[in-house]
Amino acid sequence: MTPWFLYLIRTADNKLYTGITTDVERRYQQHQSGKGAKALRGKGELTLAFSAPVGDRSLALRAEYRVKQLTKRQKERLVAEGAGFAELLSSLQTPKVKSD
């Protein structure tokens, strides 16, 4: 199983874009060349601010949604310190309950 990653890209106007991928470098290059998300086209210089492995696609999608709900200040703390990322991931991992 290919691991999925959560990443944040900083635009020239200091905004943070959140996404998921199986190959961070490839996806970053796509964004830089204008072939990635429309939200990043024409935003000037892009820098990869943060990336971390999150597990499978399902967990990556949930992590992406949760990070997109964070305030700018919380995202900046995540970028600077990785603050709270482990807790965020563990809160998303729900144990599978076997039903009888």
Swiss-Prot record:
SUPFAM superfamilies: GIY-YIG endonuclease (SSF82771)
Stretches assigned to the GIY-YIG domain: 2-77
Record SMART domains: GIYc (SM00465)
Cross-referenced InterPro entries: GIY-YIG_endonuc, GIY-YIG_endonuc_sf, UPF0213_domain, UPF0213_GIY-YIG_endonuc
Family affiliation: Belongs to the UPF0213 family.
Protein name: UPF0213 protein YhbQ
Organism listed in the record: Escherichia coli O17:K52:H18 (strain UMN026 / ExPEC)
Lineage, opening ranks: Bacteria, Pseudomonadati, Pseudomonadota, Gammaproteobacteria, Enterobacterales
